[in-house]
Amino acid sequence: MNEILVTGGTGLIGMYLKQILPNAKYVSSKDYNLLDINEVKKMFLEIKPKKVIHLAAIVGGVHHNIEEPVKYFEENLLMNTFVLKESFANKVENFLGILSSCIYPDDIKEYPIKESELLNGAPHKDLFSYSYAKRCMAIHIEMYNKKFSTNYNYIIPCNLYGEFDKFDPIKGHFVGALIEKIATAKINKEKKITLFGDGTPLRQFMHAKDVAKLISIMVLKNKFYSMNVATNENYSI
């Protein structure tokens, strides 16, 4: 499966996908700088993929998004644009981008969320830059399909967790950051922890390995679709 290129190979989903599809070509920032168009061109020239699973992203918690909005917007936008552009230039047959449920409008009241709701409102203000960079990739993919009849798709997972997450209050996903906060409080013998949120937002959670399994099924069956990936259970945070 060397014709399959997986960016973000050392990330949360990438590490699980490697267990399921070990023969794909997994790359990380140590291999290629996806913010450099020349590095991206080099990557495609050397690997010559037929399928691209684009997992790479600049990710972090809410507070880091608030502190570094330009970084989250600009770097994700550049990375996604370069990888998608070179996928087309190198005649990649299938492209699958990974988005995030935070790109949906913040005021959605009905669950499960429908894919048609994507552009029906603004995302949460604290994740504005990251969310719009991811929205841009969805639009970019759809424009390629409309103009050139490509088979490019994206999936939108809910909040993910797993052993390969960053257990860091700044850069971790919600569950990973929460575990780190509780563990730190336990070590420091603190009697309570402070969580942000008033309990009204609803979130869905899924193990990252389940998303990796879905991606592997798409790859092995050569059937790709754009869709949400989530559970039916909602939790208030």
Question: What is the predicted role of each segment?
Answer:
Residues N2-L21:
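N-terminal Rossmann NAD(P)H-binding glycine-rich loop of SDR-like oxidoreductase domains
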Residues P22-K42:
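Adenosine-cofactor binding site in Rossmann-like domains, unifying the SAM/SAH pocket
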Residues N33, I103-P105, S129, N153-A177, ...:
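Flexible, glycine-rich beta-alpha linker
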Residues N38-L77:
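NAD(P)H-binding glycine-rich loop region in Rossmannoid oxidoreductase-like domains
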Residues G61-V62, G97-P112, S129-R135, K147, ...:
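Conserved catalytic-site region of short-chain dehydrogenase/reductase
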Residues T81-L127, N153:
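Conserved Rossmann-fold NAD(P)-dependent oxidoreductase catalytic core, especially the SDR/UDP-sugar
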Residues H124-C158, A177-N188:
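Active-site Tyr-X1-5-Lys
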Residues L160-E163, V175-I193, R203-N228:
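Alpha-helical substrate-binding/gating segment
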